[in-house]
From Swiss-Prot:
Keywords: Disulfide bond, Hormone, Secreted, Signal
Disulfide bridges in this chain: C55-C108, C67-C107, C76-C93, C78-C95, C82-C97
Native source organism of the sequence: Mus musculus (Mouse)
Name of encoding gene: Retnla
Chain's role: Probable hormone. Plays a role in pulmonary vascular remodeling.
Protein's UniProt name: Resistin-like alpha
Amino acid sequence: MKTTTCSLLICISLLQLMVPVNTDETIEIIVENKVKELLANPANYPSTVTKTLSCTSVKTMNRWASCPAGMTATGCACGFACGSWEIQSGDTCNCLCLLVDWTTARCCQLS
């Protein structure tokens, strides 16, 4: 009796797994449909981003290069093949090698 009951429960469980599931509303399908809708009608969904990124380079003939006011240093380059540098205070490049003949700071600003 116990074996029959156990077998019956296993069969019922397996049958439930075999029942087709409605996959029309999975999160993947919903996202895919929304992306297609946005791409098909770009005029209906204007961009909320109105800022532009402007960048410039500042080169000095020493170990330090500072960005103009309001700009942030995003990267540095150093002369004499020095690959060791750091950004200090968010707007100044400092080359860390002993011998450096120039420093360039890449400065950017969102406006």
